Amino acid sequence: FGSALEGLENNEVIYELLADMGWTADSIDLDSWLPVYCKARYGGCPAAMDSAWQRFRETAYSSLYSYPRFTWQTVVPDTRRISKLDVSDSFLQGVELFLSCADSLESSSLFVNDAIEYASYYLAAKADDCYKRALKEDSLGNRVAAMQQLDRSVEILLDVDKLLASHPLYRLEEWVDMARDWGKTDLEKDAYEANAKRLITTWGGFQEDYAARFWSGLIKDYYIPRMKLYFSEQRADLNRWEENWIKAPWHNTSTSFEDPLQSAIKLVERYKEE
C-alpha cells in the first residue's frame, strides 16, 4: 500500500486518511473518522468544527477538477483547460464555522496554520469575484468601474499575501531559498532560482500557470503585478514581463500580521459581504 500524489506539503487530511486506509480492509466512515482526526490534529473537535467539515466535505472535498485555480491566477479565464473551484456559499460558511473555534483551539499551532489557510481561500474567493467583475466591466468598455473592481481585488489579495506570510509552508521565500541553496556560485544560485520560479509560474507552453501556487510573495510580487499589467496599456508586454520576473533575483518584501489568527478572523468578517 502506498500513495504518490502530485504536490506535497498540503491537504494533510488526505494524507492522514490514506495512511489510515492502509491499516484496514473496511471502508472508513468519515462521520466518525473526521472528529477523531480533528481531536488528534487540534486537541479538540467542537460542534462548530464538525459542522465546518460537513460543509467542506459537501463542497471542496466532494469535487475533483483538473487545474483548480482562481481567475486572478491566470489573468484571463483559461479557455483551453477549463476548470473551477468549489468555493460556494456553503464552503465559505464552513470557513466561518472553522474560525469560530478559535477561542477553544487557538493554542494549537496546527489549528492556527489551518485557520490561516482556510481564511486565505475565503478571501481569495472574494478577490476572485471582484476580479471577474473587473474583467466584465473592461470587456464592456467601462474603464472606471473595471479599475475600481481591480483595485478592490488587489486590496484583498494583499491581505491574503500578508496572512500567508505567517504560514510555515505557503511562502515563496522558502521555495527560492531552497533552490538557491543548491548553487555554489552566484551564477548557479541565480540559475536554480530562475528554474524554480519558472516551475511554479509559466512552466512552459501549454502548461502555463499549471502549478497555481497559493503563496505569500508570489501573490504580492507576481500575480498582482500581472493583473495590473493586464489592465494597463502595456498588456501586450505580459509575456516579456513574466520572463523578466523569472530571470531577475527575487527578494522577499512580504510582511506578516502580528496576530495572524485574529487577523484572519477580522479579515473574513471585513470582506464577508464582498
Predicted regions and their residues:
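Substrate-binding groove of N-acetylhexosamine-processing glycoside hydrolases
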Residues: 2-274
